[in-house]
Curated annotation (Swiss-Prot):
GO molecular function: ATP binding; phosphorelay sensor kinase activity
UniProt xrefs under CDD domains: HisKA
Originating gene: yrkQ
InterPro entries on file: Bact_Sensor_His_Kinase, HAMP_dom, HATPase_C_sf, HisK_dim/P_dom, HisK_dim/P_sf
Phosphohistidine modified-residue sites: 237
GO cellular component, one term: plasma membrane
Keywords recorded for this protein, A-Z: ATP-binding, Cell membrane, Kinase, Membrane, Nucleotide-binding, Phosphoprotein, Transferase, Transmembrane, Transmembrane helix, Two-component regulatory system
Domain of life (superkingdom): Bacteria
EC numbers, comma separated: 2.7.13.3
Protein name: Sensor histidine kinase YrkQ
Record's catalysed reaction(s): ATP + protein L-histidine = ADP + protein N-phospho-L-histidine
Cytoplasmic side, ranges: 1-12, 167-432
Amino acid sequence: MAHLKFTLTKKLALLIMVAAIVSGVIFLTLQKITDDLIEGYLSSEEYYHEESARYIQKFSKYVSENELSTSDRKAFGEWVKKENYINLTIFKDQELQYDSIYSESDYGKEKLTQYAQNHSHPVKFSDGEGRVIIDGFYSSRYYDLAFALDLLGATLIFLIIVLFGIRQSLRYLKTIHQEIHILEGGELDYEMTIKGHDELAMIAKSIEDLRKAFLDKLKAIEELQAESRSLVTEMSHDMRTPLTSLIMNLEFAKKEGGEAGASKDRYVANAYGKALQLKSLSDNLFAYFLLNKEYEADLETVAVKEVIYDLISDQIAILHQEHFRVHISGELPETYINVNLEELGRVFDNVMSNLLKYADPEEKISITFVSDQEIFEIHVSNTIKLADITPESNGLGERSIARMMSRMQGQFHSIQKNSKYYIVLRFWNTKM
C-alpha cells in the first residue's frame, strides 16, 4: 500500500487546524460552564441587594471624606467612572439632583417616585440628607474575567497541541543532526535513521544514499589497490622467469663468440622467444591498465549474425593457417546485442592469442553458439598442449577479457578441468 506523503507545510497546516478546532471547542465549553456558574451564583436577588448595599456604603464614605453636596455632580461622575458597571441616582427634597444616565436638563424636574423611594438609601451630604439609588451590572466584570480566562485556557491548549505535534519532527531533526556528527567523525558504517516520508526523511535518505555511495567508492578503490598490488607481485614473478632465461641465452650466445653455429642460433632463437613472451606480458599489462583508466564504453546496438560472423570468420581463418582444426556447432540467432566494436574485437583477439599459445593443435577446438530470448553465448573449449611454455599465472589476458565484457554489460567465465579449458562469452539480447 502506498504511503501518504505529507510535506512539513501540510503537516503543520493540518496540525494548526486540528489545534484550532480542539481549542475552539474547549473555549466554547468553558464559556458555557463559566456563564452558567456566574448566572447561578452572581445573578440572584440576594447578591444584587448585597452588592447595592456595599456600594451605598462605599459612596457614603466617599461623600463624607470629600464633604460633597448634592450639587457636586462632577465628583459623582468621577466616582461612577472609577467604579464602573454601576448607575448612580441622587434625590434631595423629592427632586432629582444627579443621574449617571440622564442629562442635566432633567435635574430639578424629575420627582422621586414610589419605586425610587422603596429602592433608595439615605446618605448624608454636606447640604443635607439625600436619597441614593445605585444599580449595577455587578456580574459583568465576572463575565469579562471568565471570558479572558476561558480564552487564555483555550490558547494554552492550542499551543500545547501544536508544540506536542511538532515535538516528533524536532526530535527527528535532532537525531539527524547527531547522526551527521557521527558520520563526520568517520563512522561511515553507521546507518542514518529514516522515518516517514516528509522533507526530513528525504534529507536523511539522501545522506544515507550518499554514505552508501561513498562506501562503495572506498570499497572499489580498496579492491583496485589490492588487485594492483597482487598483479604487480604476480607480474614480477612471471617476468622474472623469461627474463632470467633471456639473460642466460644471451650470455651463452656471447660466449660462442663471433662464430656462427647451431648452438648459437638456438640460443638466439630462445632469447627471441623469451623477448616475445616479455613483450606479450607488457602488452597485456598496458591494455589492462588502459581499460582501468577509461570510464564507460560507448555501446551501439548491432546484429549478432553480422558482427559475430565477421569476427569468428577472421579468427577461424587464422587458426586454419596455424593448422588448427575447428568444429562449430549451433547457429547465430537473428538477435541484437549492445557492444563496443573496438573492445569486442580486442576480446576476440585475446581469445585467439590464448588459443594460439596454449591450445593443442592435435586436438579440435570447439566453438558453440547458444541463444534464447534473453541471452546469446559463445562457448569455446580446447585441449591444453603439453609444452615447455609456462602459462601466464597472473591470468592477465582473462582479466582483460572479463573487464571488457563487463564494460559491454556482458559476462565472461572460464574453467580448466585437467587438460581441458573452457570459456563462455555471454551477451544480453536487446531490441533494435
